[in-house]
Amino acid sequence: MSTIVVVRKGEQAALAADTLTSWGTQRESAAYIANHEKTLAVGAGFVAFCGPSSAGHMLKNYFGSLKNPPKFSSPDDIFATWIMLHAACKDRYYLNPNEDDSDSVESTRFNVLIASPSGIFGVGSHRLVQEFTRFYAYGSGAEYALGALWALYDDPKLTAEALAIKAVAAAAEFNSATGLPVNCHTVRLK
């Protein structure tokens, strides 16, 4: 799987992701895979994903096809974007939205974190959009990343970027589906 992290501190937001791809017990590190990034620039912000590797292609193709990139300005704005993205995933990219018969709505089958000038956000696979005040993480190493963020966040010497990198590194240390190096991007908050 993956570990993705978003952090807000001061006037900076940071989004970080590991670079390991894994298929069962097979691990493919950034040393062997040229297109290993799990992050992409969208408008004035950045998006990171965890889930199937094809999610990166879907996101890049979908956002690249828009005349105007989304602003990612609020949970409602992001939800409206994700409704259209989900339809495109099914129609253009042949997404199989069936995860579990007990689900009340179809799944997009990947989770996303967003850093934009308006703040930091998460979108779950069932399109629940949350705005975070400090930090969050998704993926197989999320519990390690969240623990590191909780322990380090109040250190005045650490920026949002430093925290995000340390959180993914902590996940890589303890989670077999998370690997270094870390890709990290920052955004200046409004």
Residue ranges and their predicted role:
Residues 114:
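N-terminal glycine-/lysine-enriched basic segments
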Residues 111:
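Adenine-nucleotide phosphate-binding core of ATP-dependent small-molecule kinases
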Residues 173, 187-190:
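Oxyanion-binding and handling regions
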Residues 1-100, 105, 129-161, 178-188:
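Conserved short S/T/G-enriched processing/targeting/catalytic segments and their helical context
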Residues 161-169:
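Small-residue (G/A/S/T)-rich helix-start motifs and N-terminal tracts that mark the onset
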